[in-house]
Amino acid sequence: MSIKAVVFDVGETLVDETESWGDWADWLGVPRLTFFATLGSVIARGGDHREVFPILRPGIDLAAESRARQAAGRRAAVTIDDFYPDALVCLRALVEAGFVVGIAGNQPSETESVLASLDVPLALVASSERWGIHKPDPAFFAKIVTELGFEPAEIAYVGDRVDNDVKPAARAGLRAIFIRRGPWAFIQAGRDDPPAADSSIDSLDELPAALANLS
């Protein structure tokens, strides 16, 4: 069955999250290296990324701290400047090639306005906060299928995480494409291709060829 639609994760797939995490480190008054190393240790033991906050600041109320940051004018979501250089080029190339293209990830609802402002005709722009469903919940991928109206095998899902992207997408019947970049990708899979992935790439420049090989 040929692939008709391609849906992308956000963080470390399309967007470089270095500045987002770095801004949190600055807000907490923690050296960025310390924050990043602690985050890496949480990822390595299979923990949730939010666990980094009580490690660095015991007793933190993360929701309250997030509201305080927003009130202070700090970033609440990704920005256009955070996109990897290959991201928009890839999105436009896929649309021009005739693919239906969407973006859906574990993100705050504010991210949707940034994604919707891209100069790319996207068929789907969705955040976990708006849907009320978070990856790796199978319902997240079922929602993608319902929204696009294709068979699961006609949809490719591109993501950097083995646990949140590759495995659940494959279990849902989508074609899972693993992009090897960002801390989750290298810590979870190293240089070996995840067994559940239909294809693995090192940059989005390689995606069109990967899709052609799967069709």
Model-predicted segments: where are they?
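N-terminal helical cap/lid subdomain that shapes the substrate entry/recognition surface
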Residues: 1-99, 108-112
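Asp-based, Mg2+/Mn2+-dependent phosphohydrolase catalytic module
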Residues: 1-7, 63, 88-215
